Amino acid sequence: MIQVIVTDIEGTTTDIRFVHQVLFPYARERLTPFLRAHQQDDDIAALLVDLRREIAQPDADIETLITVLHGFMDEDRKSTVLKAIQGIIWRTGYLQADFRGHVYPEVAQQLADWHQQGLKLYVYSSGSVAAQKLLFGYSDAGDLCPLFSGYFDTHVGAKRDVSAYQKIANQLGIAPQALLFLSDIRQELDAAQLAGWHTCQLIRDLPDNDSAHPQVNRFDQIVLSLFTE
């Protein structure tokens, strides 16, 4: 029996175009002036120390680090430091109502239904936990944060690594066979499945013919009773 549902965001709860056409450009445009202005702030300074360690350049100046981060964005690298800085920049956008977090029309109601049924809901995304909370807290369906019991990001590992799903299960204290992971990416689901989880693939566009995972087009097509131990 499924006790816990863990969901991805991009392409799963949220249109990938919102991330790539709204969030990413917003952060890219503001990254350079933001870091120049706030490099001495405690939280930013700590992240820059982590970035110097990540690139093995302990003496890199701020302009070098800015160039590195722009390169990471060009590569769509899942850098924990980059994701944290993007999240801090996005916070301003949400608070100023420059945009609201997109969720597909059926997502909010289905999450609420599962929550009411007593299921525990979590998020696992490459975006920082802070960014996840902002997207759901300022979503176009209202504040969805009360529906979630917790959030995971790349601090537990990359989403295509089996060990990340093992860590999440251990942290939750839940047997893998009671966990269901929702994602649009087959390779992420492969990793979760190898960790013993149940999986379901969200297909918002064309079907993934190379996938062996159950596929649905909407959250309200997910039938939990089909996922048995």
Swiss-Prot record:
GO terms for biological process: L-methionine salvage from methylthioadenosine. The keyword Amino-acid biosynthesis applies. InterPro entries: Enolase-ppase_E1, HAD-like_sf, HAD-SF_hydro_IA, HAD_sf. Its cofactor is Mg(2+). Keywords: Amino-acid biosynthesis, Hydrolase, Magnesium, Metal-binding, Methionine biosynthesis. Pfam families: Hydrolase. Its EC number is 3.1.3.77. Binds 1 Mg(2+) ion per subunit. CDD domains: HAD_EP. The keyword Cell wall biogenesis/degradation does not apply. It catalyses: 5-methylsulfanyl-2,3-dioxopentyl phosphate + H2O = 1,2-dihydroxy-5-(methylsulfanyl)pent-1-en-3-one + phosphate. Pathway: Amino-acid biosynthesis; L-methionine biosynthesis via salvage pathway; L-methionine from S-methyl-5-thio-alpha-D-ribose 1-phosphate: step 3/6; Amino-acid biosynthesis; L-methionine biosynthesis via salvage pathway; L-methionine from S-methyl-5-thio-alpha-D-ribose 1-phosphate: step 4/6. It is an enzyme of class 3 (hydrolase). GO terms for molecular function: 2,3-diketo-5-methylthiopentyl-1-phosphate enolase activity; 2-hydroxy-3-keto-5-methylthiopentenyl-1-phosphate phosphatase activity; acireductone synthase activity; magnesium ion binding. Monomer. Belongs to the HAD-like hydrolase superfamily. MasA/MtnC family. Bifunctional enzyme that catalyzes the enolization of 2,3-diketo-5-methylthiopentyl-1-phosphate (DK-MTP-1-P) into the intermediate 2-hydroxy-3-keto-5-methylthiopentenyl-1-phosphate (HK-MTPenyl-1-P), which is then dephosphorylated to form the acireductone 1,2-dihydroxy-3-keto-5-methylthiopentene (DHK-MTPene). This is Enolase-phosphatase E1. It comes from Yersinia pseudotuberculosis serotype O:1b (strain IP 31758).
